[in-house]
């Protein structure tokens, strides 16, 4: 899944340098999320039994919420950065209080209590070595 335009650019560049042959499937590709935080998923590839691992949430998890909403799957988000942690905690807390979340960037979330409960947040990151990083 490609989380944003930067990842899409890297994917296109890598494919240009090292072309790969992609097999066609009977499934259509579905864009989930918004123009900044999105992922591309083959339709019918996920189910309620699926778990999606999402790395680098930042301050926009519309794609993660969209996956839960579209497929009913569980999503595990991994991002240890303080702003991302604060963003998720505020969204979760307000959602569980029955309130709508409006973040600093102007984005609004419409997420249900059941949807937010299907998202697990971990303050962990992928790194090239086993160490503690400061943000």
State each model region's role.
Residues 1-135:
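Phosphate/nucleotide-binding beta-alpha loop and adjacent structural elements of enzyme active sites
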């Amino acid at each position: 899944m490609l989380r944003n335009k930067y990842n899409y650019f890297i994917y296109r560049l890598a494919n240009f340098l090292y072309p790969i042959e992609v097999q066609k499937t009977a499934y259509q590709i579905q864009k989930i999320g918004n123009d900044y935080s999105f992922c591309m998923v083959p339709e019918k590839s996920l189910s309620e039994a699926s778990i999606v691992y999402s790395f680098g949430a930042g301050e926009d998890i519309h794609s993660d919420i969209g996956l839960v909403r579209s497929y009913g799957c569980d999503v595990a988000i991994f991002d240890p950065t303080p702003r991302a942690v604060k963003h998720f905690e505020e969204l979760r807390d307000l959602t569980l209080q029955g309130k709508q979340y409006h973040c600093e960037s102007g984005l609004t979330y419409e997420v249900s209590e059941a949807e937010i409960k299907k998202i697990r947040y971990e303050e962990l990151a992928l790194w090239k070595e086993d160490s503690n990083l400061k943000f």
